[in-house]
């Protein structure tokens, strides 16, 4: 028994020790001898585990393993991360019976999909007299404060959002580092751990019946999670940013999209909270100011800088728009989403899209890369999403969102749903504007002129010369035999006549727009510049 109680640090997102206000709150009484219990609970939903593929689950488990190793290293083995499987309130109740909990501290999960879980925890704490502490650190600003500052309603345009956060002020700097080396930690008895469903060590994906699929052999990049990896990648990313700033341009990943090189994105680490968004934001801004100052000393003026973290601000906007909208991930009941009459769900079309069997090499390569690695360049995300919806198959964005949430490492509920609504012209876009449709063939020729990407992820086409690799349907029967690629046998026929589909879809969008005498309240860009700057918000 511990007479003064113990403090729980409940990890959900925010899988890190740096910039962790919840950790600081849990350590406030350490000088009084109140020990710490760091926990993560597999409850079937937290950290996006309701529907999760192998790569996403492995990334999460990597992150938990890294946390456990850091805790043990900093405390010479006295501290560790307790990983449970079960219902959080039942676990907390049982812990309280054994060690009398004083506080439960957690990073605020602002999305409405976590409301039921967190409200149950609050009710339990009120019942048992436990203090429940939530701290904002997964976003730059508290979305609830943004809405309150905007008069109690979410800002319908990005410009309104910017105006609101300017009133609030710049985002807080990262919190000070927590000193855990001298903290006291609870050691749970083996019988109690077993009773509570506590793992002896961080489990593997197979424990949850999640297995690597048959696309794994295509993987070029093996993403690993964890704070240690995230901070190392941040240093590499800042070198890229410095080089770009010194050359006078910003957002280098957008200025020169390269679908073949190893990505330098931090988005997966931001999604799981292995890297603090505030640490990233201020690291980039401080770097730009230093580069700007050094240039000024040399008599060189570097202009701009307003957009260097623009993608992070869009991330904030999507979080804010979702916070009071439990139907944000669907059309029905979603007040900001236009109800577009998509075609009846066609499982054959959807499955061919999911598996990369559409007959369009760039689409197929991208969808297979997603399954193999859990990753896609932002340009490819836009392309496959447009192809599924208004730019091709005319299927609803909802199945696409579900697929991305399962397999994409950095997919979180708010940002991923917001991106799908934008790309499908359902929200955050000019009203039902289908004028900008990416042609996957033309894009492939521009981004992959030699066919390197296609040969890697669509090996059926590896023998094709570059003149045909993006349009294999142009091969004659003799050429198909020569290059050992029979269309319809080794590689599928095209799923649709794309040019006809695009024209039909544009007509449908135009007809729907004309039928709306009074357009519904619609999240939209404030001006053309926002449309120009928008890319799938992934490659932060």
Curated annotation (Swiss-Prot):
Origin: domain of life: Eukaryota
UniProtKB keywords: Biological rhythms, Chromophore, Cytoplasm, FAD, Flavoprotein, Nucleotide-binding, Nucleus, Photoreceptor protein, Receptor, Repressor, Sensory transduction, Transcription, Transcription regulation
Cofactor binding: number and manner: Binds 1 FAD per subunit.
Essential cofactor(s): FAD
UniProt: FAD binding residues: 237, 265, 267, 311, 378, 410-412, 416
Predominant subcellular localization, coarse grouping: cytoplasm
InterPro entries: Crypto/Photolyase_FAD-like_sf, Crypto/Photolyase_N_sf, Cryptochr/Photolyase_FAD-bd, Cryptochrome/DNA_photolyase_1, DNA_photolyase_N, Rossmann-like_a/b/a_fold
Location of the Photolyase/cryptochrome alpha/beta domain: 5-140
Keyword Cell membrane appears in the UniProt entry: no
This protein's GO CC annotations: cytoplasm; nucleus; perinuclear region of cytoplasm
Keyword Repressor: yes
GO molecular-function terms, A-Z: blue light photoreceptor activity; DNA binding; FAD binding; flavin adenine dinucleotide binding
Gene Ontology biological process terms, A to Z: circadian regulation of gene expression; entrainment of circadian clock by photoperiod; negative regulation of DNA-templated transcription; regulation of circadian rhythm
Compartments reported by the entry: Cytoplasm; Cytoplasm, Perinuclear region; Nucleus
Domain observations: FAD-binding region regulates cry stability, cry-tim interaction, and circadian photosensitivity.
Record's function text: Blue light-dependent regulator that is the input of the circadian feedback loop. Has no photolyase activity for cyclobutane pyrimidine dimers or 6-4 photoproducts. Regulation of expression by light suggests a role in photoreception for locomotor activity rhythms. Light induces the degradation of cry, likely due to conformational change in the photoreceptor leading to targeting to the proteasome. Under circadian regulation, expression is influenced by the clock pacemaker genes period, timeless, Clock and cycle. Binding to tim irreversibly commits tim to proteasomal degradation.
Protein family membership: Belongs to the DNA photolyase class-1 family.
Quaternary structure note: Interacts with tim and per; promoted by light conditions.
Official protein name in the record: Cryptochrome-1
Source organism of the structure: Drosophila pseudoobscura pseudoobscura (Fruit fly)
Upper lineage: Eukaryota, Metazoa, Ecdysozoa, Arthropoda, Hexapoda
């Amino acid at each position: 028994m511990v007479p003064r109680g113990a403090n729980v640090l409940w990890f959900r997102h925010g899988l890190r020790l740096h910039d962790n206000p919840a950790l600081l709150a849990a350590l406030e009484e350490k000088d009084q001898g109140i020990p710490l219990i760091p926990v993560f609970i597999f409850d079937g939903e937290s950290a996006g585990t309701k529907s999760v593929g192998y790569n996403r689950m492995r990334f999460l488990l990597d992150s938990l393993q890294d946390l456990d190793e850091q805790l043990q290293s900093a405390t010479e083995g006295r501290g560790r991360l307790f990983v449970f499987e079960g219902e959080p309130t039942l676990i907390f109740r049982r812990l309280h019976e054994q060690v009398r909990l004083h506080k439960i501290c957690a990073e605020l999960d602002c999305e409405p999909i976590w409301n039921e879980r967190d409200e149950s925890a609050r009710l339990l704490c009120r019942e048992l007299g436990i203090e429940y502490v939530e701290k904002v650190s997964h976003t730059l600003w508290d979305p609830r404060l943004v809405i309150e500052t905007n008069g109690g309603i979410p800002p319908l345009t990005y410009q309104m959002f910017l105006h609101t956060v300017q009133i609030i002020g710049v985002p807080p700097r990262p919190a000070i580092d927590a000193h855990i080396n001298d903290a006291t930690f609870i050691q749970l008895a083996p019988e109690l751990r077993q009773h509570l469903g506590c793992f002896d060590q961080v489990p593997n994906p197979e424990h949850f019946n999640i297995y690597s699929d048959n696309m794994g052999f295509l993987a070029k990049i093996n993403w690993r999670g964890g704070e240690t990896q995230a901070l190392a990648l941040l240093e590499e990313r800042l070198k890229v940013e410095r080089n770009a700033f010194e050359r006078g341009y910003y957002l280098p990943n957008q200025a020169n999209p390269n679908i073949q090189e190893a990505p330098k994105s931090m988005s997966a680490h931001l999604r799981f909270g292995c890297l603090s968004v505030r640490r990233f934001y201020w690291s980039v801004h401080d770097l730009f100011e230093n580069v700007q100052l050094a240039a000024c000393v040399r008599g060189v003026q570097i202009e701009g800088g307003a957009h260097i973290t623009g993608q992070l601000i869009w991330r904030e906007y999507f979080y804010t728009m979702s916070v009071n909208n439990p139907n944000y991930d669907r059309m029905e009941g979603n007040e900001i989403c236009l109800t577009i009459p998509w075609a009846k769900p066609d499982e054959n079309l959807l499955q061919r899209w999911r598996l990369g069997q559409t007959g369009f090499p760039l689409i197929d390569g991208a969808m297979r890369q997603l399954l193999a690695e859990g990753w896609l360049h932002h340009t490819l995300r836009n392309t496959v999403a447009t192809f599924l919806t208004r730019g091709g198959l005319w299927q609803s964005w909802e199945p696409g969102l579900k697929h991305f949430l399962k397999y994409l490492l950095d997919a979180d509920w708010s940002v991923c749903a917001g991106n799908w609504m934008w790309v499908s012209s359902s929200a955050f876009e000019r009203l039902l504007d289908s004028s900008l449709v990416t042609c996957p063939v033309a894009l492939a020729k521009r981004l992959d002129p030699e066919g390197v990407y296609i040969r890697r992820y669509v090996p059926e086409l590896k023998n094709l010369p570059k003149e045909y690799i993006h349009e294999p349907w142009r091969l004659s029967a003799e050429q198909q035999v020569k290059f050992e690629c029979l269309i319809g046998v080794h590689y599928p026929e095209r799923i649709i006549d794309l040019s006809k589909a695009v024209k039909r879809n544009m007509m449908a969008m135009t007809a729907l727009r004309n039928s709306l005498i009074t357009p519904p309240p619609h999240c939209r860009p404030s001006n053309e510049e926002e449309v120009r700057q928008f890319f799938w918000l992934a490659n932060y």
